[in-house]
Amino acid sequence: MADLKAKFLNVYSVLKSELLQDPAFEFTDISRQWVERMTDYNVPGGKLNRGLSVIDSYKLLKGEELTEEEIFLASALGWCIEWLQAYFLVLDDIMDNSHTRRGQPCWYKVPKVGMIAANDGVLLRNHIFRILKNHFKDKPYYVDLLDLFNEVEFQTASGQMLDLISSEGENDLSKFSLSLHRRIVQYKTAYYSFYLSVACALLMSGENLEDHVDVKNILVQMGIYFQVQDDYLDCFVDPKILGKIGTDIEDFKCSWLVVKALELSNEEQKKILNENYGKADPEKVAKVKALYKELDLEGEFADYESKSYEKLITSIESHPSKAVQAVLKSFLGKIYKRQK
């Protein structure tokens, strides 16, 4: 795995140097340095799970060792997903007025960057299609790749819009529901974090995505389960372990926990939620967390987790292809009972 990650990071360097020599634009030294620094700061810094999953999935679908060329192409698609993630995060952080990301200041918070970050986000988005053109233009699935990235980007941006407009305006908990939570998560997270990697691997394997709607549905369910875990960890796990400070309560987010709490609360408890949810005051946040404990949301989550796992395993095992089953089980194995 360490060897694969090293190969994957090597491909990043190749793709980056191609982008910095792109003949469609006349770079100056200053503009080239800016793009290099911006890309290095935002693209390769995460866990790289989405990108590496393309290689894993393709290998399982092919059922044998990959050639160097195949590893390179699967890595290039993996990096396109990491570039997509970087583009969303750079812009998300501006919208959310965030301060840190992956343990360092958000890009727009870096001195002399500021609102230039908005254009940098757009540039990162454009890099994806330059990479696809450079390496996949002659492939029979090139148009399908373009369609796939465009559609997933549209779904993610629409999910982000839902998330933003649901926590905007007057703090009104009555607009939160399990179906709103599910819809936000499905579009904002599940398509690009779960479906996209496998869809890339399927296209590389010569498959038609229209024949794999069942795979998409399973991965979307997995993405929803992943986000519910995220909502739970945001509140119940030590930020030192998590690597970030959870602010869902302060930010009035439509999180699974608050939706569950509303479902289980009596009138008195609902009053506590209404008075304290979405406020930055640490005492109010503590009151919400105390109510979550009182309602045994830890137990509710454990119950949700085991039921989701059972359901997913059943769906996966009913799939006719053992190779596809292996891909889906590998994804589920990475996230089941995770602690961060």
Curated annotation (Swiss-Prot):
Q: Give its localization.
A: Cytoplasm; Nucleus
Known cofactor(s): Mg(2+)
Q: Please give an example of a GO cellular component term from this record.
A: nucleus
One biological process term in Gene Ontology: farnesyl diphosphate biosynthetic process
Which of this chain's residues are annotated to bind dimethylallyl diphosphate? 101, 188-189, 227, 244, 253
Enzyme class of the recorded protein, top EC level: transferase
Locate the residues binding Mg(2+) 2: 92, 96
- Return the cofactor note field: Binds 2 Mg(2+) ions per subunit.
The primary site where this protein sits is: cytoplasm
Disulfides per UniProt? none
Q: Provide the organism lineage as a comma list.
A: Eukaryota, Viridiplantae, Streptophyta, Embryophyta, Tracheophyta
| Pfam families associated with the record | polyprenyl_synt (PF00348)
Q: Where does isopentenyl diphosphate bind?
A: 47, 50, 85, 102
> Does Cytoplasm appear among the keywords?
yes
Report the protein's function: Catalyzes the sequential condensation of isopentenyl pyrophosphate with the allylic pyrophosphates, dimethylallyl pyrophosphate, and then with the resultant geranylpyrophosphate to the ultimate product farnesyl pyrophosphate.
Q: What PANTHER family has UniProt attached to this entry?
A: FARNESYL PYROPHOSPHATE SYNTHASE, FARNESYL-PYROPHOSPHATE SYNTHETASE
What's the Enzyme Commission number for this chain? 2.5.1.10, 2.5.1.1
Origin species: Cannabis sativa
**Protein's name according to its UniProt entry:** Farnesyl pyrophosphate synthase 1
In this chain, Mg(2+) 1 is annotated as bound at 92, 96
